[in-house]
Amino acid sequence: MDFFISTKNRTDKEELMDDFSIGGDLLRDTLDKLENINRWLGGNLVTVNSLKSVLKNHPKEAEITIVDIGCGHGDILRDVAKFGRKHDYKFKLIGIDANPTAIIYANELSTEYPELTFKTEDIFSDEFKNRKVDIVLATLFLHHFKEEQLVSFLSDTLKQTQKAIIVNDLHRHKLAYYLFMLLSVFIKNKMIINDGLISVLRGFKRKDLEIMSQKVNVKPQISWKWAFRFQWIIQK
């Protein structure tokens, strides 16, 4: 745990969660606790509210295919499903994650949501690139990749997406780092503490998102949200 840090540039340190072989009780406990932390801080609402904005003028009788990349155990998609049911949308929801244990757990937790399916899949694979979807969700996911990977991925994904890519990710800021360090005193999970601090340092400044927007030739729609999140909506 580093006390003196710089947020000028994104770190290239890897998180423990980048190892897709991690599974068992450790991963399940990590995903459960992350869900609780994100709900407490209001992070999941950033994604749902972004979706609400994108669907503002969408006819409710038309089916909407939404893919959540890096879905973990599916908490975001279950929130999206609840939103869809409440507002009478016809959602087809697909969760994708490279960790097979996460996908198994997502299926176990989503038996009451027939509109959800989960798949173990690599977002850089041809299988993913051949998907045709309306909306792609990326919540606390893009910071796992380097800028050149993200520019390539976003360029390809825009071609297969009919409406929008919705990004909800971390603001790289010293205060966010130290606040998480303080919060970690109450977290009984070493994986979350390690990865949470690295995640902040792998996060983004507004300028990073603006530069990537230019590179993929889209008009940036970037808003800062609590707690140290950037909402980045890329609409077609």
Residue ranges and their predicted role:
Residues 67, 73-75, 80-125:
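Class I SAM-dependent methyltransferase SAM/SAH-binding core
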Residues 137:
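A conserved beta-strand element that flanks and buttresses the S-adenosyl-L-methionine
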Residues 161-170:
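Conserved beta-strand signature within the Rossmann-like core of class I S-adenosyl-L-methionine
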Residues 24-50, 54-55:
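Class I SAM-dependent methyltransferase Rossmann-like catalytic core
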Residues 170-213, 222:
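C-terminal alpha-helical "lid/dimerization" subdomain adjacent to the S-adenosyl-L-methionine
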Residues 1-32:
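N-terminal, positively charged/glycine-rich alpha-helical extensions of SAM-dependent methyltransferases
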Residues 145-156:
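A short, conserved alpha-helix within the catalytic core of class I
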Residues 206-236:
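Conserved Class I S-adenosyl-L-methionine
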